[in-house]
Amino acid sequence: MSDKEVLLEVTSDHLNTGLRGVPVGTCRTSFVTPTEGVHYCGYPIAELATFAPEDIIYLLFNKELPTPEQSREIRAELAARATIPGDVESVLKTLPRDGHPMDWLSVGIHTLGMLETTNDWREDAMNLIARMPRLMGLIFRIRDGRADGIPADDPQASLVDRFVN
C-alpha cells in the first residue's frame, strides 16, 4: 500500500449515519461486525466473557487463548509482578478527596511509571496490569476516607479477587 493510496471517501451521507460502515481506524487485535459485534483476536466478545481476565490478557499478548498450563503461567507471572514499588499509597493520600477518580488513576499510573519502568513495552504493560487491582483498591478506599486499616494485598489471588478485596 502506498502512502498516497485513497482508502475511503467520506460524503455528507456518511455523517448523517454516524459513520456506520466507514472505517475510522485499524487495530491488529480487534474488529467489529454488524452482527456479532466486537471481536478480540478473532473471538467474539460474548464468547470471551466466559474466560478469566488473566486468560484474555494472555490472548491479547499472544493472539491465542492459553492452554491450562499457559493460564497457570500467566497467573504466576502476574502474581510475581503485583507488588507496587515505592510508596504509592502516600502519594495518593496527598490528593484532594473530591478530585475526579480518573485524575486519581492518572496520578497513580504516572507515579508507578516514575517509580519503576523498564523501557520494554511488554514488561511495563504486564507490570501495570498486575498492579492495577491494588492501585484501584487504594484509590477507592482513600477517596472514600477509609485509608486506615487497608488490608494487605494478596498477589496469589486472581485479578478480580484482588480488585474487590
What are these regions (language model features)?
Residues 1-165:
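Hydrophobic alpha-helical bundle cores within soluble ligand-binding/oligomerization subdomains
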